[in-house]
Amino acid sequence: MGLLACEKNLVEANQEWEFSNPKNANLKIVNTYTSNVPAGAPGVGVTRFYSYQNSSKLNGNALSSPGSWPGPTTYASLMPGSSTFNFLLDRRIGNNYGVIARGDTAFKGTITMEAGKYYTMFMIGESPSQSLYLVEDKLTDPQERFYAVRFANLVVSSTPKPIDVYSRRERKKIANNLIYKTVTDFTELALPSVSDTLDVMDAGTTRILYSFNTFVPTSRRIYTFYTYGRTGFAAERLTSYTNR
């Protein structure tokens, strides 16, 4: 009986995680942090983070860049309202928030989320001016044989430049003049018969900066593409995650 009860509780917990609880807020965290300072765990070579809502630890595995939490197509169901979020270096491995050593908190911010809504929290910038950028995800299921997509420009530069995004299958730009720390609305596009290539261009030109090759969207899925990197330090790239 005890084993069955345990399994039942796990199933209920998984259902709450996968399906939205209208009493909670839904959050996805995306790490685009480009600096390798402050240093993380010894010998790791990259800076990774554990995240806390108030004093509650959220992720079991440290989050590196580029990366998202929780898993694909999933949001974390969290307490709504105003909360303090702290992102601590992975050299702190305990579950308890406790007393924080000086320099261990790389990101900190007070975030307000409403019950029943979906959000993405981007970890952006470079040390020592990194910050948290919260965006509401207004998710509407696309029609059959269509998908939805949006774009975010999160490349760090001393002289940020706007970008355009060009779809080779659509043969047109599907995002225009996107400035730093800006996210477009979702756009619904017809499902391509073959894979697409998305080119990031200097705004107003046809000069390709970098591309995302072999994008194969799925019918009725919702995607976010974001640029990341730091001019002159970390290679600039375009990558994506699935909202739903």
Which residues does each predicted region cover?
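Intrinsically disordered, low-complexity polar regions and short flexible loop motifs
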Residues: 6-244
